[in-house]
């Protein structure tokens, strides 16, 4: 299992939200480049980057910062948030982003998703952001009528090789991941699963490793000092 430290961006700053609520924003750092370099120095194998402005606005608001960051560190970066056309997918990947995360578009435009997979294969991941069993889009602000298990199975059938699963109600809470949700997905699909939302401490990391998923995304636990990124990386390598 790999550990993906998270950097969520609003107005060019690294922030954390509570349960996806934009009104409950906490700035954790003004310089995202320093954070990324620190993650690199601690041995991060991947960095998870989210353009929260983009997720809300529907286009890649912080694109310049994201592309500059890709040139700043020698660690693969995955990016999500507001990526809703092929041109943006193409630009990000052609300029050094290792993996692009599609959420809203995966729900609303299967044709575009298929085209992205045909062109870029495993560089395309789908974000499944859910609450009460249903998938949300548009920056976690719009509930769909899609059950997360049905959606995951459909994504697998379309050729998606990896999914990032977030329980919105857990995000930023330090309450621990939704293991029940992850186990149901693990039994249902045969694709890479990355867990996001609620990771509290090193014990959670050990538990996630034991269920044998691809990755774990953690932000608040690192920024709050609850979790040592280096220790998490060391025990999962």
From Swiss-Prot:
Catalytic activity, as annotated: 1-(5-phospho-beta-D-ribosyl)-5-[(5-phospho-beta-D-ribosylamino)methylideneamino]imidazole-4-carboxamide = 5-[(5-phospho-1-deoxy-D-ribulos-1-ylimino)methylamino]-1-(5-phospho-beta-D-ribosyl)imidazole-4-carboxamide
Q: Which domain of life is it from?
A: Bacteria
Q: Where in the cell is it found?
A: Cytoplasm
Question: GO cellular component annotations, sorted alphabetically?
Answer: cytoplasm
Q: In which pathway does it act?
A: Amino-acid biosynthesis; L-histidine biosynthesis; L-histidine from 5-phospho-alpha-D-ribose 1-diphosphate: step 4/9
Name-wise, this protein is: 1-(5-phosphoribosyl)-5-[(5-phosphoribosylamino)methylideneamino] imidazole-4-carboxamide isomerase
Keyword annotations from UniProtKB, A to Z: Amino-acid biosynthesis, Cytoplasm, Histidine biosynthesis, Isomerase
GO terms, biological process: L-histidine biosynthetic process; L-tryptophan biosynthetic process
């Amino acid at each position: 299992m790999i550990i993906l430290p998270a950097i969520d961006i609003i107005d060019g700053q690294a922030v954390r939200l509570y349960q996806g609520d934009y009104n409950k924003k906490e700035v954790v750092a003004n310089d995202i480049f320093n954070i990324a370099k620190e993650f690199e120095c601690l041995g991060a194998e991947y960095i998870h980057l989210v353009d929260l402005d983009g997720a809300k606005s529907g286009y890649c608001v912080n694109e310049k910062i994201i592309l500059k960051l890709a040139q700043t560190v020698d660690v693969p970066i995955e990016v999500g948030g507001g990526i809703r056309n092929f041109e943006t997918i193409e630009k990000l990947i052609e300029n050094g982003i290792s993996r692009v995360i599609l959420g809203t578009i995966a729900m609303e435009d299967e044709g575009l998703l298929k085209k992205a997979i045909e062109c870029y294969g495993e560089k395309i991941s789908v974000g499944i952001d859910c609450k009460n069993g249903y998938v949300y889009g548009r920056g976690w602000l719009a509930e769909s009528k899609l059950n997360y298990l049905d959606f995951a199975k459909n994504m697998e059938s379309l050729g998606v090789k990896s999914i990032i699963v977030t329980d919105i109600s857990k995000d930023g809470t330090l309450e621990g991941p939704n293991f029940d949700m992850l186990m149901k997905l693990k039994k249902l699909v045969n694709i890479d699963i990355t867990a996001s939302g609620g990771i509290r401490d090193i014990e959670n990391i050990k538990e996630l490793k034991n269920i044998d998923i691809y990755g774990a995304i953690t932000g608040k636990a690192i920024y709050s000092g609850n979790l040592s990124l280096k220790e998490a990386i060391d025990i999962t390598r």
